[in-house]
Amino acid sequence: MAAPILHPETPEENIVYYTILWTWGFWVIGALYIVAPVVGWYLAYRALLRYVGQSSSACMRAPRIPFGIIVWWVSMGAMLFALVAAHISFDLGLGSMLKSSIGWAKGWGLMAVFPWIGAMSPIRAEIVYRATNKLALQTLLLVPIFIGAALAHLPHPLYVSPLQIVGGPGPEFFRVELYSIDETNGNLRWSFFAPWSPAAAFIANVSLVFALYDRSRFWKWIGVACCVVVSVLSQSRLALIAIPAVVLLLAIFCNLTRPLTLGLASILATLGLLSASPIMSLVDTFTQRFNQARAASSRVRAVLRSIALHRWESEAPIFGHGVVEKGPHIVEHMPIGSHHSWYGLLFVKGIVGFAALAVPLAWTILELLVKAQADRVARCALGVVIIITFYTFGENLEILSYLFWPGLVVIGIAMRRRVFNPLRCRFERLQASGAEGTQLAHGSSI
């Protein structure tokens, strides 16, 4: 099947399309962490101008604000409020508060900015799919270079960009590294343009969902192949689970109105109740093997979670500590609450921050679940949300939002689309066909 030709048609589509295509170029100069916030806030400003009616073309004005977008803005605003409250509570100083607020604009703030852009700007989801799949092709072509660099024992990292001076979570966000070596077992791992290997697999999983919904068979297989290659080379355990899981869950969640799906679900639920004990045993066995696959990493993650939970409960249950703190030597001084969005939120922003992510995620899943019964874009967006939800248990979403922002744009596009009720549509078609039959019968009798 020939690939449908897709070209950007609006300034917003051009910016999104070419920002994705130039990902590797931005990575080479260490600007990837800077580009996403700049592009995001600029496009958000353009969308705001269009919404208030200052666009030069009346037909280009934005529609009403979807309720889901309001939920995301209010929730991310609550994140900022918790951050400020924690700084005041622990007397961390104005300088630290300003620095953390800028960090919010480059992290959690983007979780509201990019859905807003998707919902309020003239951007087609297909443009995002195709740009991401073209980036996947670039990545596949670069894989031999990355492997060759490891075989040739080139320095790692090659260099750290001087753009690090603008500030960020750490030097890994500005370094150019062709490969890395796992300190726990000596294995080679590749992080591609992400700061670390599991983050690369996370972005690959989001790209997989885009590939599944690209109408071109060629680009579809390019995207799928890239996801598998990146997931394997990154050695991410969660990615290898998420790939089949998202495909299976999408097949179920997007067909809930079909009698066959409901019947199979009833049968499986009954069998699950009758076989609860063997299933739990299998789950326990799988969990043990999953943790043993990289035992040192699992141990560090468990200790980090324990420290974060204990200090949250005993020191700052409402608004958290306000800032990230390094852990003790037993966890190799990794930040407390890292490797897990929920524990990280509890430690840094307390129960307020925890709820500020849980509420919009839950609303988004429910809204897209309804729309996905008949809307193709909503199905893709639901897949993205499923992947994001998976990775809240293995990554810190805040510091990776600059990488998975195309998924947030597609979520926004899906939110602006109207809810379509397939059952009601079928009923209306039956009514229309019945009325047409009555008219034909009446005409023949005349």
Where are these regions (language model features)?
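Membrane-interfacial entry segments at the cytosolic side of transmembrane helices
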Residues: 124-135, 218, 255-268
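Long extracytoplasmic/lumenal interhelical loops at the membrane interface
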Residues: 281-349, 368-374
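Hydrophobic transmembrane alpha-helices and their immediate junctions
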Residues: 2-4, 349-389
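Alpha-helical transmembrane segments of multi-pass inner-membrane proteins
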Residues: 129-155, 168-234, 241-252
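A membrane-periplasm/extracellular boundary helix in multi-pass inner-membrane enzymes
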Residues: 80-87, 144-155, 251-292, 313
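Hydrophobic transmembrane alpha-helices of multi-pass, membrane-embedded glycosylation machinery
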Residues: 38-46, 208, 225-232, 240-253, ...
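Transmembrane alpha-helices of multi-pass inner-membrane enzymes
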Residues: 40-48, 382-389, 396-446
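N-terminal hydrophobic segments of proteins, predominantly signal-anchor/transmembrane helices
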Residues: 16-27, 41-119, 141, 386-392
